[in-house]
């Protein structure tokens, strides 16, 4: 097992990475102070890992309840969030009740938001079971739900007590979900660590084949990078925005098609291709680097052509973005691997990118 620490002073927490961690009681024990625990999971993950987690919690002598939600991005909304609150209230959960998010990014985001809101804040633990949630969404305290007009526009910054990333859970992940997680790994290397990007380029096949050593290294390095960024800029005042490379275009794809039509990682993969194209058109990135990025995204079995939503619709959706200021769209663009710039882009360059990258 490897442990990466997120250094946030009194709110620091560990990220434990390794195989067969969901069943290890000692990883949960230090982070559960109250008398009760509520596991939040979904209809896909519950039959796979619910019993394992409950067995791990049993020696602690806590009252354990489970809320099982429908699976998918389409359910990341107020209605589903209220199912968590219903479960907490029915179980008479108090301020010391610990929530455990057992699932992918949707479960983690909603459980974290519920924890931030219930009784104005209760502790929670992330147990991410998808590659995307292990390398990205479970780390850093971003929680929330979608709105029909924008992705993740309603939420809170609220840090977990711990992240327990069980690499073994990736063995049950569908190929499409695995590829979606590789997208966030590619993003992390592209924005922050050129040497890591080189490694990803050389090992993308091993990642898609689920080589355990490759996956463990990718999760570890991605978490190290994100932990460093979050420690420096927890609330996305500046530096943390670089983690949104590919997300401005990607969120527009998700909202434009309807949440759940494309997986988040698929939209981010394609969004990185679009952002790299715009980086070249605005004079920040060389063509050879753009081509390298596109090849890696394609090798990860991710889409590289965006849906044709229409130029006006793309622009409209990208204006509903947390980085936008006074209606001006800000993009995370590449200067070289490991270095980004946060900047507006000329309308003609954006339109040219849309023309070149949509089908």
Curated annotation (Swiss-Prot):
Keywords: Amino-acid biosynthesis, Aromatic amino acid biosynthesis, Cobalt, Cytoplasm, Lyase, Metal-binding, NAD, Nucleotide-binding, Zinc. GO terms for biological process: amino acid biosynthetic process; aromatic amino acid family biosynthetic process; chorismate biosynthetic process. It is an enzyme of class 4 (lyase). Pathway: Metabolic intermediate biosynthesis; chorismate biosynthesis; chorismate from D-erythrose 4-phosphate and phosphoenolpyruvate: step 2/7. Binds 1 divalent metal cation per subunit. Can use either Co(2+) or Zn(2+). One of its GO terms (molecular function) is metal ion binding. Its EC number is 4.2.3.4. It catalyses: 7-phospho-2-dehydro-3-deoxy-D-arabino-heptonate = 3-dehydroquinate + phosphate. NAD(+) binds at residues 71-76, 105-109, 129-130, 142, 151. Transmembrane segments: none annotated. Its cofactor is Co(2+); Zn(2+); NAD(+). It is found in: Cytoplasm. GO terms for cellular component: cytoplasm. Zn(2+) binds at residues 184, 247, 264. The keyword Cytoplasm applies. The keyword Amino-acid biosynthesis applies. Catalyzes the conversion of 3-deoxy-D-arabino-heptulosonate 7-phosphate (DAHP) to dehydroquinate (DHQ). NCBIfam families: aroB. Belongs to the sugar phosphate cyclases superfamily. Dehydroquinate synthase family. This is 3-dehydroquinate synthase.
